[in-house]
Amino acid sequence: MEPQLVAVSVLVSALICYFFFRPYFHRYGKNLPPSPFFRLPIIGHMHMLGPLLHQSFHNLSHRYGPLFSLNFGSVLCVVASTPHFAKQLLQTNELAFNCRIESTAVKKLTYESSLAFAPYGDYWRFIKKLSMNELLGSRSINNFQHLRAQETHQLLRLLSNRARAFEAVNITEELLKLTNNVISIMMVGEAEEARDVVRDVTEIFGEFNVSDFIWLFKKMDLQGFGKRIEDLFQRFDTLVERIISKREQTRKDRRRNGKKGEQGSGDGIRDFLDILLDCTEDENSEIKIQRVHIKALIMDFFTAGTDTTAISTEWALVELVKKPSVLQKVREEIDNVVGKDRLVEESDCPNLPYLQAILKETFRLHPPVPMVTRRCVAECTVENYVIPEDSLLFVNVWSIGRNPKFWDNPLEFRPERFLKLEGDSSGVVDVRGSHFQLLPFGSGRRMCPGVSLAMQEVPALLGAIIQCFDFHVVGPKGEILKGDDIVINVDERPGLTAPRAHNLVCVPVDRTSGGGPLKIIEC
């Protein structure tokens, strides 16, 4: 028996060593990007990470350089923190990184069929083309402009009423409500209360689930993610199933009554849900759209169109409250271009360069999605470093925006850095993925398709708010902060996006005395 026990012990030890050190064997001899020498069995370098991954990666880049690698369990992860390597990975080697990272939460909550996370291929190309033509193209964006204006006016009325009563407003929640209503009307023709689900989904998408990286824990729910994911799935699926079923019944009733013409929001504009339901009935469609595809796309646009837009507007307001001189300067620009008798509109924004610069500076310091994530689908070489297939890529947009090698005084909120000076093109930095020092929407084929909508909606919303109101910030104990006491917490909360850790609560102050632009919307 004793020799048999020895043999079994040796076999078990060999298996354990093989699985623990398999990453070393598998990649032996390859010139991988620099990596911390010490890593623990099973978890690899996970012990070096905090709850905010982009900040942890930023700190590690100071020690290991602009391109380094980490092991999350047995999974190799590559982190890029400079415009040069961002361009090498997202443009030069774009085809090798044309897929997104799909976690357990992403797969479940997007029905494995979303535009944002679907593998690059025929389905993804078809859905992107459909989305750009029918929802995110210039024609559709312009068609829904009046609806965005209505939601902005509704928020301004709320702020005006609270200003008269000298009552506090949770700006964070009101911005989420507005952006959720906008994308909901564009998607399904009516405002839906989905913002709580959306915030929870974006949070869990960005949280670190060890079961996604360590084979030993694949079937274990050590952090309770499984239950949270299932609860979120049921909440969202119930909501979206009700929406789809209601629309299907409406379509049946119209056909039964012999009615034809536009459906959707009821104002002559077709929403995206109607178009998707048409696709399910089209036998000649190049890709057969099914119910799960519709649910996945609604999830896509609810999460992408609600949280990111609200976050960017809130961060801009925070920075303007902290920097009164910048706030005064942009108000002077608005007064000179728009006047004092009407509200800022989307059509005004191209003529408001300082307002646009404020938005870009906000994206630099507070990108709504702090990292561009990809999965390597084919081994490639970057600057003599080998990136193996199935490696995960993180381009740290947050870190790039705070790098003193590319930005003077990077922690200072200074919109002037984005203004075009006469005879100098240094201020001409676009946000559409061609300038790799500023990538709030990513770059290449997989960049955010909603960039045009965001660049129309956010500056007009921000401009209208600051045109009409000042704000007294409310402290954590309910006190109004004044003078040197105005210290706004800028900590971030973990998640796929980078919202503030604490809601922005303010008492609005009407700077128009109920006249001017607010009088037009009958405040």
Curated annotation (Swiss-Prot):
UniProt pathway annotation: Secondary metabolite biosynthesis; flavonoid biosynthesis
PROSITE patterns associated with the record: CYTOCHROME_P450
UniProt entry tagged with the keyword Transcription regulation: no
Residues involved in heme binding: C448
Topological category with respect to the lipid bilayer: Single-pass membrane protein
Keywords: Flavonoid biosynthesis, Heme, Iron, Membrane, Metal-binding, Monooxygenase, Oxidoreductase, Transmembrane, Transmembrane helix
GO-annotated cellular components: membrane
Catalytic reaction equation(s): a flavanone + reduced [NADPH--hemoprotein reductase] + O2 = a 2-hydroxyflavanone + oxidized [NADPH--hemoprotein reductase] + H2O + H(+); (2S)-liquiritigenin + reduced [NADPH--hemoprotein reductase] + O2 = licodione + oxidized [NADPH--hemoprotein reductase] + H2O + 2 H(+); (2S)-naringenin + reduced [NADPH--hemoprotein reductase] + O2 = (2S)-2-hydroxynaringenin + oxidized [NADPH--hemoprotein reductase] + H2O + H(+)
Record-annotated membrane-spanning stretches: 66-86
SUPFAM superfamilies (UniProt xref): Cytochrome P450
Recorded family membership: Belongs to the cytochrome P450 family.
Protein name: (2S)-flavanone 2-hydroxylase
Source organism of the structure: Glycyrrhiza echinata
Gene, per the UniProt record: CYP93B1
